[in-house]
Amino acid sequence: QAVRQMMTAARTAPKGKGIDIIEVAMVTDEDIKRLSEELVIMSGETGLKFFLRDADNILQAEAIMIAGTRQQVQGLNCAHCGFPTCVEKPKTVPCAINSVDLGIAVGSACATASDLRLDTRVMFSAGMAAQRLGMLGDCKCVMAIPVSASSKNPFFDRKTKTE
């Protein structure tokens, strides 16, 4: 129920130009294990040990909200992406407005979790794993918010993996 409220907050968050390109979903049970396994694979591929730490850490979540953005040029020619016009921006470079929209949606979801006194942490690592697993279709930038209701937030004061 609480994660659904977070998803609603992300869904209804303000969007640039009023265009909704945000996708949200809830990850539970076996899919959390799949995310964890993907993080282990990612650590092996990159050598980044914090992926291992996060692989263990998300197993303590009761659920994980994932949010991502479909890439869609907004046609503002604002140059915020680093290119003078939307036409000149390579397809592989995200529209800055898309990223801002995702940040606002994630912030809104976290504010809702805080209002409900839930423990969370925004994780790009678990978001990347969800993206690699296609959990949000063709979204190109995905963030994950593991959620727990416990006496101490399990997503902080984490130990770095050394092996």
Language-model segments: residues:
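Acidic, surface-exposed loops and disordered segments
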Residues: 1-163
